[in-house]
UniProtKB/Swiss-Prot annotation:
It holds the Pfam family Intron_maturas2. Keywords: Chloroplast, mRNA processing, Plastid, RNA-binding, tRNA processing. Disulfide bonds: none annotated. Usually encoded in the trnK tRNA gene intron. Probably assists in splicing its own and other chloroplast group II introns. Belongs to the intron maturase 2 family. MatK subfamily. GO terms for molecular function: RNA binding. It comes from Sullivantia sullivantii. HAMAP family: MatK. This is Maturase K.
Length: 506
């Protein structure tokens, strides 16, 4: 908290940890506009602009309370948001600035926690790909997996109460209540919105929504893991230490009493030393080496946990239990499964010979081709059946710029899906992008694709095919055999922290 106090630089509020005064600082809205919130900006560049603009912000808050136009038509979203008349810009500006402010204590506590644990390369833990080596190492020994959809929407007051344990500023919490209750369409952030309208909150205030949703999930997981550890043979080692919160242990004690009264089940029924929990976005996975009966117990345990503690109605049908050997996990753009590779061994002993059937488990990861084609079709690189088409909006750019754009997209897709066991589907994606690039260039020069490719030669083909090899040659500059073997095998990059729009096909 010392770093947080130093960042505020407000002597008047130093002893109370108030966040509300930051709303009147202009640099907060610069951070919100540029979407560059990170530790270096928070801690190193806090002297960017200390000019107070309380009059402007007060006018925005007053004006925002006098209007209630949350839903707009799809055509209105194409207007200039800054030069045109937009009644929702005031609420958007305040909410984005507020999202930056409430993220400050969370970011600083996370940094101090990582430094206290002496985790040097903490940025690698943020990578999406870091979860797949964990799956490779552990899922081969498990039998059953449960796909879980985290229930929502949650009551608005529960969200405010969740933040109350972290943010000790009543004024900021009152402002948050104002956002949530003033606009009744806040639930459209979580539930689908009608096709004829676009929700201002869901489309333009995603930062505040993501923060509130993540705080809710963090609260749910911290309580769940805490109770899990109380009834397990082995304590969880991968979950970080919980931050100190007001009344946390008192609430946990009350929750344990509620469950002990409502569910008089012996603790050993839930004990499983080989249980793994993984979560990304609104999905989570619970894998176990035990029997389906054990996962069924956890299934109904979670349903009652959500209903009793968060007052969220959840159906048991949202949790599916499957056998790993017969089920594929649709997770982060990959289809992951555990396959049995049969092998026959002939054993010769004197005059007798025996044939031994042996099955070896293998963690298989493939890239689903149809969702990728749908993503390319949505981006206007091909039609719905995968036939490449030109990109007319790019035809006005230079030839080198057009080629560079297509190559960059191809490189990003190959980079993200580098962990696939078989890369045959990626070759088709490269073919679609290459031919779409050729059609775009031919459209620009008013020529046919055949004539343009004949004039260009094999240069365009080399641009698309050598990107992966060039990236690997930087890592293994002297090992050509190793380079080719890695090019055909699985590679996980720990610098990927978000999913590209073309990859996020869920």
């Amino acid at each position: 908290m010392g770093e947080f106090q130093g960042y505020l630089e407000l002597d008047k509020f130093r002893q109370h940890h108030f966040l509300y005064p930051l709303i009147f600082q202009e640099y907060i809205y610069a951070l919100a506009h540029d979407h560059v919130l990170n530790r270096s900006i928070l801690l190193d560049n806090f002297g960017y602009d200390n000019k107070s603009s309380s009059i402007i912000v007060k006018r925005l808050i007053t004006r925002m309370g006098q209007q209630n136009h949350l839903l707009i038509s799809a055509n209105y979203s194409n207007k200039n948001k800054f030069l045109g008349h937009n009644k929702n810009f005031d609420s958007q500006m305040i909410s984005e600035g507020f999202a930056v402010i409430v993220e400050i204590p969370f970011s600083l506590r996370l940094v101090s926690s990582l430094e206290r644990k002496e985790i040097v390369k903490s940025h690698n833990l943020r990578s999406i790909h870091s979860i797949f080596p964990f799956l490779e190492d552990n899922f081969l020994h498990l039998n059953y997996v449960s796909d879980i959809l985290i229930p929502h929407p949650i009551h608005l007051e529960i969200l405010v109460q969740t933040l109350r344990y972290w943010v000790k500023d009543a004024s900021s919490l009152h402002l948050l209540r104002f956002f949530l209750y003033e606009y009744q369409s806040w639930n459209s952030l979580i539930t689908p919105t009608p096709k004829k309208s676009i929700s201002i909150v869901s489309q333009r205030n995603q930062r505040l929504f993501l923060f509130l949703y993540n705080s809710y999930v963090c609260e749910y997981e911290s309580t769940f893991i805490f109770l899990w550890n109380q009834s397990s043979h082995l304590q969880s080692t991968s979950y970080g230490t919980l931050f100190e919160r007001i009344y946390f242990y008192g609430k946990i004690k009350h929750l344990v009493e509620v469950f002990s009264n409502d569910f008089p089940t012996a603790p050993w029924l839930f004990k499983d030393p080989f249980m793994h929990y993984i979560r990304y976005q609104g999905k989570s996975i619970l894998a176990s080496k035990g029997t389906p009966l054990l996962l069924n117990k956890w299934k109904y345990y979670l349903v009652n946990f959500w209903q009793c503690h968060y007052y969220v109605w959840s159906q048991s049908g949202r949790i599916h239990i499957n056998q790993l050997s017969n089920h594929s996990l649709d997770f982060l753009g990959y289809l992951s499964s555990v396959r049995l590779n049969p092998s026959v061994v002939r054993n010769q002993m004197l005059e007798n010979s025996f044939i031994i059937d042996n099955a070896i488990k293998k963690f298989d990861i493939i890239v689903p081709i149809l969702p990728l084609i749908r993503s390319l079709a949505k981006a206007k690189f091909c039609n719905v059946v995968g036939d490449p088409i030109s990109k007319p909006s790019w035809a006005e750019s230079s030839d080198s710029d057009i080629i560079d754009r297509f190559v960059r997209i191809c490189r990003n897709i190959s980079h993200y899906h580098s962990g696939a066991s078989k890369k045959k589907s990626l070759y088709r994606i490269k073919y679609i992008l290459r031919l779409s690039c050729a059609r775009t260039l031919a459209r620009k020069h008013k020529s046919t694709v055949r004539a343009f490719l004949k004039r260009l030669g094999s240069g365009l083909l080399e641009e698309f095919l050598t990107e992966d090899e060039q990236a690997l040659s930087l890592i293994f500059p002297r090992a050509s055999s190793t380079l080719w073997r890695l090019y055909r095998g699985r590679i996980w990059y720990l610098d990927i922290i978000c999913i590209n729009d073309l990859v996020n096909h869920e």
